[in-house]
């Protein structure tokens, strides 16, 4: 089912309905979707996956996935999931259900698509180098080509770069998946996915089915910059700019005085 964000967290009748659904054990997966996924609606929504045939060992749990920040931009008003992104989202569900064989088959599919058996991070790094080298080659070739041939030369390299970037995108999706789940072990990922029990949902979260209430936020990556040291550097730069500004104002004022203004 596709539902609004309101119906998965509102109280009143909506809450009563959610409680009854949760108590059945048939709520399988809840997924948040970002903006601009539908032509007629730009607002975010939620996907409800209900399953009366859930295995016994999963009846007491629900998988929450927050995919609001995971998508491909088509244009200013349209987002979508690429085929590989859809496969990755499916892979999270497979691992939650213990279907590791499907996950491993996806890794094999990635390697086949990339025609490379190295670790995905190595493949990504190599492709990034290839893209950069191709850009530099293209720039030099276009500059060296006769004026009448420059457009054709640029188009030739654009096609080659497009093919390389497509492979790089696939490699990045493979890295995105394997950095989180390795060779096929499900784990809760802050900001992305979380398995919660019916007791937690009903008694601690007020029957909310909002994935964001469970998955939390992704940790902020450390960029390796010493904040205090950087602030001192910025302060010093500001003082130098202020001093330079004062000197310029003095020069301008002096010149105006000499002109009798």
Question: Predicted segments — roles?
Answer:
Residues 4-5, 9-257:
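A conserved structural/catalytic subdomain of Rossmann-like adenosyl-cofactor enzymes
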Residues 259-261:
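Long, low-complexity or tandemly repetitive, helically biased scaffold regions used
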